[in-house]
Amino acid sequence: MDTKDSNSSQALAIDGGAQTRPTDDHASLTKRLTQPRSDRSQSPEGRPPPLPPRPETLILLEDGGAAPGTPRPNVSAVHPGLQSRATTAVSLAEISQNDRGKDALAVRSFPGTVRAKASLSHLATPKDGSDAGDSASVTSYVPYSESGDVENIFGSLASSEVGIAQEESTGLMQFPEFQADDVEDDFASELEPVGEIGEGGENEGTVLAYGSTTAETDQLIDLVLEKWKAKRKHYIILSAAGKPIWTRHGDGGLISTYVGIIQTIISSYEDSNDRLNGFTAGDTKFTVVAKGPLYLVAISRILESDTQLKLQLEALYMQILSTLTLPALTHLFSVRPSTDLKRPLQGSETLLSTLADSFTKGSPSTLLSALECLKIRKSHRQTINNTLLKTKVSKLLYGLVVAGGRLVSVVRPKKHSLHPGDLQLLFNMIFEAEAVKAGGGESWIPVCLPGFNSSGYLYIFFELQAMKNALVEKLEENGSINNIKEAIDKGRPSTTDIVPGSVLHHFVYKSRVNVQFIMSAYDPEFSTITRRRRLISTYNNLHASVHAKHTHVKVHHCVTQSSSSFAWITPVFELYCVAGPHANRNALAQSASKVVQWVQKEEERLFIISGAVF
């Protein structure tokens, strides 16, 4: 692939846990820390006394935060320069007491006030200090240890039974409960078409919006509207002038009235020099993202936070840019603010819909802002990498081997890598675009990757087709194609394959360094779309709470009537797991620790560490 700017013919190239231990005399320590360096050098003490020895284990989250009989140090004097006060508060009870007031409610109220740090527009490029909250927390990193130590570290995260609220004493997260959890509902119908209201409109033969008489027409329109209102989730894109551009359900005729209301509400805030980010009405959440001349709106009755909905809207915006590029989009609306964008986007509606449906069904990739890799032997992946390097051509910018929606290998320039959000767009195009399917897997349409360069297109030249053919031939000769097929057929590992007798039903592990994740098999507990959606909602809750702005402790545990869930965040990884509602807390913690140890052992099979670099 090569890339060219849309306004220029010039070719482009892609391119631990610090602790502060209080001494017996805080005043003396403060004096030594604040006096000038020259004065300290003249001190008769010569140098500050050594810190007290580090305890062998941390008994976190028990009442009082310390072992029985251990005197509690005075933590009232905290150095103002520290990133976090969690260095002296080693229990959720302590933190809750210290933060009681303006911060306590902010930490525990979901989903209105919790905020995650992730953004699709800055994937894999965290700002300096973005992990300060992790590195400054006592519980942000726990070395791999034996199961006996795990009980001390995690054992008292939750000491209450299901349904008993002991939020202040144990740190249990009070998440909303699912409705009708033990029965299958009609969630599968969420993705079915509702019909259209247009001249002779018909959506895949589902509903005709016009009858032979006025009464029949009104009846059909009412039926379409009822189906539209019954949907749990909507995505609507409109222009700043109030013109409908795209909606996941229905058509412009169906949503025109609602678009007018949305545009009026947003404009009223803008007239007051304010910006509307979202609001909640009953159990329905409205999230708004303004991108230049476009407004993107998500309306959801599914358990998701504002930040998660915002990430989804940003991904839809990137999908639009992949078709038009940012300069083209800006030019269209600068010339004519009332531009109808439906025609320029014609043909890409399917990509928008499939991307939106993946969010509705539940997308771990979007939630974690990471990519899933195919588990394969290290030697097999290295063979594929070497084959990519041997067959590459001079104009190659980036190459991918993808199987079953999971990344197998990449070939890339040294010190350059593609944006994970861009790779998600590529995956969506490869596996969902009708043009690619009709072309037997080939597409010559230029595509913009906004995370890399929102101003230009990537082009596929003829010589790259020759490279693809040569690569496939070599992969078949050395047996790599069969190795990939076997890895796909083997499927994701089950929790009991990794930890025999584990109480875990499912887990997701993200490598923060590699911006990649792996997860266990959905079967048998989450084999239906409804149960899978509830699983992702549980992960949504955990992710939002553990990444909340005022959260200090990075180990969270939640018990509801349907499940026990657990999150463990360190500077190295993020682990989210789910078990049954009556799972023993120590067994849950031990299983989580063993999963981390398994990932550490299998890391080069689970993740692409460097890929094929040239």
Curated annotation (Swiss-Prot):
Belongs to the MON1/SAND family. Disulfide bonds: none annotated. In complex with CCZ1, is required for multiple vacuole delivery pathways including the cytoplasm to vacuole transport (Cvt), autophagy, pexophagy and endocytosis. The MON1-CCZ1 complex acts at the fusion of vesicles with the vacuole, through its regulation of the SNARE complex during the coordinated priming and docking stages of fusion, and particularly at the stage of tethering/docking. One of its GO terms (biological process) is autophagy. Transmembrane segments: none annotated. Residues 1-81 are annotated as: Disordered. It comes from Emericella nidulans (strain FGSC A4 / ATCC 38163 / CBS 112.46 / NRRL 194 / M139) (Aspergillus nidulans). It is a peripheral membrane protein. This is Vacuolar fusion protein mon1. Signal peptide: none annotated. Keywords: Autophagy, Endosome, Membrane, Protein transport, Transport, Vacuole. The keyword Transferase does not apply.
